Amino acid sequence: MSQTVSQLTRQPELEILEIKNDSIIFILSNTDISVANALRRVMIAEVPTMCIDLVEFESNNSVLCDEFIAHRLGLIPLVSDNIDKFCYTRDCSCSDRCDQCSVELRLNVKCTENRPRDVTSSDLLSQNSAVIPVSSQVTSSNSEQEIPIVKLRRGQEIKLRAIAKKGVGKEHAKWSPSCVATYQFQPIIVLNQNRIDELTDQQKEEWVGSCPTKVYSYSPHQSTQQVTIEDPLRCVYCLECKKKAESFGKPDLVHLEQKQDKFIFTVESSGALKPEDIVLYAIQIIKRKLTDIQGQMAEGML
């Protein structure tokens, strides 16, 4: 029997497990691997941010040549919370650049002391208070948050103008807002309690300890003395528990399976965007792409 479009249509769901300042973990369910992979790729390569793309040097007598410093400046993540307010340079009506498509940053540092002077991302001064180096918005005085650019000795100086533009990761990796964007299938773990009961206390402890991510738990001092699944989401499919069970002559002690329509995503942000915003932008981009395809199909172009 043929299936209708409504029967084939899925309604993907997203469940957030954890949100931090620089990362998010969520479950994408009721969909297939093609959608999961599309979401991952868009988060890496098609969510726009602001990054330094042009550097004009006025003075530089440091140990690093202009190209080295320009490359380092381009890799400094800039806060891009207002990215929607900027347009791409190629789409802007200006002849060269303007406030609608770019942001100017200045770096002017001279070492006047006998000890070396560290030039860092905190020395970059932006003409737009909303587009600044990510390290500059850290309120603590911890210098480890600052990104080093170059060291100057007495008498050396560096003076330049940098232009930040809007772009995406598929043009250059510096525009990617994601440090990490990975997913794995949600595991299905089933324990054979009859087989587990045949193990000695020592064997139970050895079997539970064979899992490097501590999926299982067992305490011989508890009244039940049962092996339990503590957190199935920790499973990385290393199969160490299967190997240990086989060494005990009980290969059917545990059953592992991947749930094909449920994916656990881990996304870490460079700081340019909040991790939850990366996910939302990616979903919007995918929806826009699908809408464009629908429009072209309706016009008979596909």
Curated annotation (Swiss-Prot):
**Keyword terms:** DNA-directed RNA polymerase, Nucleus, Transcription
Check the record and name the InterPro entries matching this protein: DNA-dir_RNA_pol_insert, DNA-dir_RNA_pol_RpoA/D/Rpb3, RBP11-like, RNAP_Rpo3/Rpb3/RPAC1, RNApol_insert_sf, Rpo3/RPB3_RNA_Pol_subunit
Instruction: Please give the coiled-coil regions recorded for this protein.
Output: none
Compartments it resides in: Nucleus
Pfam families from the entry? RNA_pol_A_bac, RNA_pol_L
GO cellular component labels: RNA polymerase II, core complex
Annotated GO MF terms = DNA-directed RNA polymerase activity; protein dimerization activity
GO BP annotations of the record are:
transcription by RNA polymerase II
Taxonomically, the superkingdom here is Eukaryota
Name the major location: nucleus
- Subunit description: Component of the RNA polymerase II (Pol II) complex consisting of 12 subunits.
Function noted in UniProt: DNA-dependent RNA polymerase catalyzes the transcription of DNA into RNA using the four ribonucleoside triphosphates as substrates. Component of RNA polymerase II which synthesizes mRNA precursors and many functional non-coding RNAs. Pol II is the central component of the basal RNA polymerase II transcription machinery. It is composed of mobile elements that move relative to each other. Rpb3 is part of the core element with the central large cleft and the clamp element that moves to open and close the cleft.
Q: Which PANTHER family match?
A: DNA-DIRECTED RNA POLYMERASE (PTHR11800), DNA-DIRECTED RNA POLYMERASE II SUBUNIT RPB3 (PTHR11800:SF2)
State the family it belongs to: Belongs to the archaeal Rpo3/eukaryotic RPB3 RNA polymerase subunit family.
Official protein name in the record = DNA-directed RNA polymerase II subunit rpb3
Record the organism.
Answer: Dictyostelium discoideum
